[in-house]
Amino acid sequence: MTDAAVSFAKDFLAGGVAAAISKTAVAPIERVKLLLQVQHASKQITADKQYKGIIDCVVRIPKEQGVLSFWRGNLANVIRYFPTQALNFAFKDKYKQIFLGGVDKRTQFWRYFAGNLASGGAAGATSLCFVYPLDFARTRLAADVGKAGAEREFKGLGDCLVKIYKSDGIKGLYQGFNVSVQGIIIYRAAYFGIYDTAKGMLPDPKNTHIFISWMIAQSVTAVAGLTSYPFDTVRRRMMMQSGRKGTDIMYTGTLDCWRKIARDEGGKAFFKGAWSNVLRGMGGAFVLVLYDEIKKYT
């Protein structure tokens, strides 16, 4: 194997392992966030049974669905997240070679910053093309509030993918893909671009104290998450459309979804679950730092 291939494989492994560990740890927060985002578009959650907020959600989930339901959709998320994050990190470095080749970060700051934004955004969009059906399934499984058996919309990951494919074809598994690409470019651009730029400005980036790295990563994930959150809400709502027919369809398309959420629920609705997203972002910050630490030993 060439040095480039070995480097690519190390990036893939380090990113994937770090992501799988952190995602499982924050899975309960992730599910709360998803339920708050999509409950208005769920056939299972009637208006009188909607969650009032994070605390209400955390209290009611174990009572109504059991404690283990906090991890509903987590298998799909781990399977999805391993290649997603691994591909993001691996492609990020490849795109950095394209966008940042020959750029001096000290004398060409804005070009360096723009190159980091471009490489982060392109990496996120590229990896999304490969794993979107898994992201779709994770969302639908997390949104499934049935207690067990017949009450559940889907029995598991495979059942979800098969049912939606039979009902809507491949299009159903990619529902909300366009707005996802828009959101992922914004999120990844900030996530990687600002993080790498900030680390690059440090006197000795390779030997930065882990606490400083974590603080930078924490700030980056919070800002990136809030900036792209409305796009995430719209894409999750669009995912809830798959498998529906006729009058059950709430939104005719992405623009209609944006318009109806703003008109019927107000601007705040785009940010439902955003606070839990910031908490979840601690896991994302941990991934960035853990990835750098793992790479030191590989």
UniProtKB/Swiss-Prot annotation:
N6-acetyllysine: residues carrying this PTM: 105, 147, 155, 163, 166, 268
Modified residues (N6-malonyllysine): 23, 92, 96, 147
Stretch list, region Important for transport activity: 235-240
Tissue-level expression: Present in kidney, brain, heart, liver and skeletal muscle.
Keywords associated with the record: Acetylation, Antiport, Chromosome partition, Membrane, Methylation, Mitochondrion, Mitochondrion inner membrane, Phosphoprotein, Repeat, Transmembrane, Transmembrane helix, Transport
GO molecular-function terms, A-Z: adenine nucleotide transmembrane transporter activity; ATP:ADP antiporter activity; oxidative phosphorylation uncoupler activity; proton transmembrane transporter activity; ubiquitin protein ligase binding
Domain of life: Eukaryota
Motif (Nucleotide carrier signature motif): 235-240
Residues modified as N6-succinyllysine: 43, 105, 147, 155, 268
Transmembrane stretches, start-end: 8-37, 75-99, 110-130, 179-199, 211-231, 274-291
Residue(s) carrying N6,N6-dimethyllysine: 52
Record's protein name: ADP/ATP translocase 2
UniProt organism field: Rattus norvegicus
Protein encoded by which gene: Slc25a5
